[in-house]
A protein has these predicted regions:
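Metal-dependent de-N-acetylase/amidase catalytic core
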Residues: 1-12, 93-232
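Active-site rim/loop-helix segments in enzyme catalytic domains that contact anionic ligands
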Residues: 1-109
Length: 232
C-alpha cells in the first residue's frame, strides 16, 4: 500500500453492474472490513438485466437474479448495506437526474472514501462503466455543497464531504493494497455471480494470477491497484 493511506470508518462503492465491484475492489474492502471494521455500502446503478445469452430468461428475471447474486457476493466479504438504483443495463447517460440520485445516496450513507470505475481509463469501451465513473465523481462533488440539489436538504438530510476517491479498472494506478489474506474471499464473492461466471474453468487460478501480478510492482503477495485522488 503506497502512499500512506488511513483505512476509513465508512466506504462506498458506486458502480454500473452487479459484479463490477467484485472484480474491481472486493479484496481491498474485505481487508478493511476484516482489519478495521469499515462499514461498507454498495450502490449499484443498473440492474444488469441484459447480462444473459439465454433467450428464455426475461430481463426482469435477470435483474432479480443479479440483485440476489450481488447481495450474496457482498455478504461474503461483510458488506452491510446495498442500494440498487435500478437503471437500465447498457443505457446509462450522464444526466443531472443521475447525478442527483448519486448525490442523495452519498449524503444518506456518508462515506469517507468512494470507490468507482475510472472514467478516464484508456480504451474503456463499456459506456455504462464510463458513465458510472463520471456520475459517481459528479455526485461526490455535488454532495459536499449545499447549493447542489438543495431540495434534498429540506427534510434533515445534510451535505457531506467525501475525503478520498479510489478508481478501479485504471491504467494509471498510483496506490496498491495488499489482498494476500483476502484474495480467496474476493474469489468467493465473484463465485456468487453464478449467472455470469458459473462453470468457467480455471477462473480462480486466473484471479490469483492477476492479483499476484498486480502485487509484483510493490513486492506484495497479491494486490489491487487504484488511481487515488485526495479531495481538498
Amino acid at each position: 500500500m503506497t502512499p500512506t493511506f488511513e483505512i476509513p470508518k465508512r466506504a462506498m462503492a458506486i458502480f454500473a453492474h452487479p459484479d463490477d465491484v467484485d472484480f474491481g475492489c472486493s479484496g481491498t474492502l474485505a481487508s478493511w472490513i476484516e482489519s478495521a471494521g469499515t462499514h461498507v455500502t454498495y450502490c449499484v446503478i443498473t440492474s444488469g438485466q441484459k447480462g444473459t445469452h439465454d433467450p428464455e430468461v426475461t430481463p426482469a428475471e435477470m435483474a432479480e437474479t443479479r440483485q440476489r447474486e450481488q447481495r450474496a457476493a457482498g455478504e461474503a466479504i461483510g458488506v452491510k448495506e446495498f442500494v440498487f438504483l435500478g437503471h437500465q443495463d447498457g443505457e446509462l447517460e450522464r444526466t443531472m437526474a443521475l447525478r442527483g440520485e448519486v448525490c442523495r445516496v452519498i449524503r444518506e450513507h456518508r462515506p469517507d472514501v468512494v470507490f468507482t470505475n475510472d472514467p478516464w481509463s484508456h480504451y474503456q469501451i463499456h459506456p455504462d462503466h464510463r458513465v458510472a465513473g463520471w456520475s459517481a465523481l459528479d455526485g461526490v462533488i455535488a454532495a459536499r455543497d449545499h447549493l447542489f440539489f438543495p431540495e434534498q436538504l429540506t427534510g434533515g438530510l445534510k451535505k457531506h464531504r467525501v475525503s478520498r476517491v479510489l478508481l478501479f479498472g485504471t491504467r494509471d494506478p498510483n496506490i496498491w493494497f495488499d489482498i494476500g489474506t483476502t484474495v480467496d474471499r474476493k474469489i468467493a464473492a465473484l463465485r456468487a455471480h453464478k449467472s455470469q461466471l458459473g462453470g468457467r474453468k480455471g477462473f480462480a487460478e486466473r484471479m490469483r494470477w492477476w492479483a499476484k501480478n498486480t502485487g509484483s510492482t510493490w513486492k506484495l503477495p497479491a494486490a489491487e491497484a487504484f488511481r487515488y485522488i485526495e479531495l481538498a
